[in-house]
Curated annotation (Swiss-Prot):
This is Methylenetetrahydrofolate--tRNA-(uracil-5-)-methyltransferase TrmFO 2. The keyword Transferase applies. GO terms for cellular component: cytosol. Its EC number is 2.1.1.74. It comes from Mycoplasma mycoides subsp. mycoides SC (strain CCUG 32753 / NCTC 10114 / PG1). Gene3D superfamilies: FAD/NAD(P)-binding domain. InterPro entries: FAD/NAD-bd_sf (IPR036188), MnmG-rel (IPR002218), MnmG_N (IPR040131), TrmFO (IPR004417). Keywords: Cytoplasm, FAD, Flavoprotein, Methyltransferase, NAD, NADP, Transferase, tRNA processing. The gene is trmFO2. It catalyses: uridine(54) in tRNA + (6R)-5,10-methylene-5,6,7,8-tetrahydrofolate + NADH + H(+) = 5-methyluridine(54) in tRNA + (6S)-5,6,7,8-tetrahydrofolate + NAD(+); uridine(54) in tRNA + (6R)-5,10-methylene-5,6,7,8-tetrahydrofolate + NADPH + H(+) = 5-methyluridine(54) in tRNA + (6S)-5,6,7,8-tetrahydrofolate + NADP(+). It comes from the Bacteria.
Length: 438
């Protein structure tokens, strides 16, 4: 078989897949359209742009996000390697300078001798002749969406996603805010609100003017990324239990406020901060008006406003096998958020897994599914499980893991150790089958 792979989309999944295949002597043509067609959320021409957040979530090996990153490191993830090198203070999270991250990752991909970058709007998938990985993410172009529909049928789905505002540090009134962190591993800027201030702010959110959605879009928010105003409209208590929770955010007098708005460092220069959990669909003038009612942010300068966008994904259980391969078209694979995984690390890791299977396909080798004792294996099993009637976007979590003896174990790191051991054994077998050196 011709050892060349066409990858559509230079996002997190596409770049991970390209890097893995290229490192295994596969020629990769990586197609990217963002220099030709702009969209409402991406701001630069660099690959793998981080739109919603600047964090790859917790590094704790007691939770799924931390375990998945450990699995990715073991699989030689480019995304995690670059993220580790661009790390900024983020409490227990792996937070990065988002521009530095995308820039450095782009440099690695563009300078790889086995990767050719092609700036082109791909509108047709040659599913008969090309070995293709579709990793176009949530912002797939209309032309390609139509051709994907031709390929897989009318089984594509979507949800509404949103991003948060970013403000300049020098516009914050530090007489009214303080530094604190829930996990004592890092510091966030905390804007405290008393009960009256909180209620007034919540009312402002509820009554603020939003960008109008179409009728069929109004009830399909992804629950992990709901706009702050949507939470407020559902119940003010959701704000106190979620993004405005004051728990363990004590001020300099060891006092816990009624509620808190957290600001997280967004760049290596420590000049920009994003509003944690404040994804929004408010009109831009309304964002400025409402957010400037928060104590300490009265003169806040917003350098990037929150926006909302539609995320497309396919009905993977009906379309893909465990290899992330289209069941009816064996030379077409999918990876990333378009498969129904949700989140940066979930998308990136699916790119690695798709690339492993593409390498096996090229070499006519058969490999087994990843063990469901690993986060990546369990997540892949979830999105490709034919028993799922209606796929909803899924972040990694411990509930989907296969861990029969967890509750008989006294090891609080049971899930991590189980994942580590089973992945190590799997990689050993994989290297023997594929001749790789992972």
């Amino acid at each position: 078989m011709n050892k060349k792979v066409k990858i559509i989309g230079a996002g997190l999944a596409g770049c991970e897949a390209a890097y893995f295949l290229a490192n295994n002597n596969i020629q990769v043509e990586l197609y990217e359209v963002k220099t030709l067609i702009k969209n409402e959320v991406q701001k630069t021409n660099n690959f793998a742009e981080l739109v919603c957040f600047n964090t790859f979530r917790s590094q704790s090996l007691l939770n799924a996000a931390g375990i998945l990153k450990a699995e990715m490191r073991r699989l030689n993830s480019l995304v995690i390697k670059i993220a580790d090198g661009c790390k900024i203070d983020g409490d227990d999270a792996l937070a990065v300078d988002r521009e530095d991250f995308s820039k450095k990752l782009t440099e690695v991909i563009k300078n790889h001798p086995n990767i050719t970058i092609i700036e082109q709007n791909v509108s047709h998938i040659d599913d008969e002749n090309d070995l293709t990985l579709i990793a176009t993410g949530p912002l797939t172009t209309n032309e390609l969406k139509e051709d994907i529909q031709r390929l897989i049928g009318k089984q594509k789905l979507f949800f509404i996603d949103a991003s948060a505002s970013i403000i300049t540090k020098d516009s914050i009134d530090f007489n009214k805010v303080y530094y604190s962190g829930r996990h004592k591993l890092g510091k966030y800027i905390c804007c405290p609100l008393n009960e009256q201030e909180f209620n007034e702010f919540a009312d402002n959110l509820i009554n603020a003017e939003q960008v109008q959605l179409k009728e069929f879009e109004k009830s399909i928010f992804f629950k992990g990324c709901q706009p702050i105003e949507q939470l407020a409209k559902t119940s003010k208590k959701l704000l106190l239990k979620g993004p405005m929770s004051p728990n363990n955010l004590l001020d300099q007098n060891n006092h816990q406020p009624y509620s808190v708005v957290q600001l997280r460092q967004d760049d290596a220069k420590d000049s920009l901060y994003n509003m944690v959990g404040f994804q929004t669909n408010l009109k831009w003038p309304e964002q400025k008006r409402v957010f400037q009612t928060i104590p300490g942010l009265e003169k806040a300068k917003i350098v990037r406003y929150g926006v909302m966008h539609k995320n497309y994904y396919i009905n993977s259980p009906k379309i893909l096998n465990f290899k992330l391969q289209v069941m009816r078209k064996k030379n077409v694979f999918f990876a990333g958020q378009i498969t129904g995984v949700e989140g940066y690390i979930e998308s990136a890791s699916s790119g690695i897994w798709a690339a492993i299977n593409i390498l096996a396909f090229i070499n006519n080798k058969k490999i087994k599914p990843l063990p469901n004792t690993t986060i990546l294996g369990a997540l892949t099993n979830y999105i490709t499980n034919s028993k799922i009637y209606s796929l909803k976007p899924m972040k990694c979590n411990l509930a989907i893991l296969e861990q029969e003896n967890k509750y008989q174990s006294n090891d609080k790191f049971y899930s991590f150790n189980n994942s580590k051991n089973s992945l190590e054994e799997y990689i050993k077998q994989l290297n023997q089958i594929l001749g790789t050196s992972i």
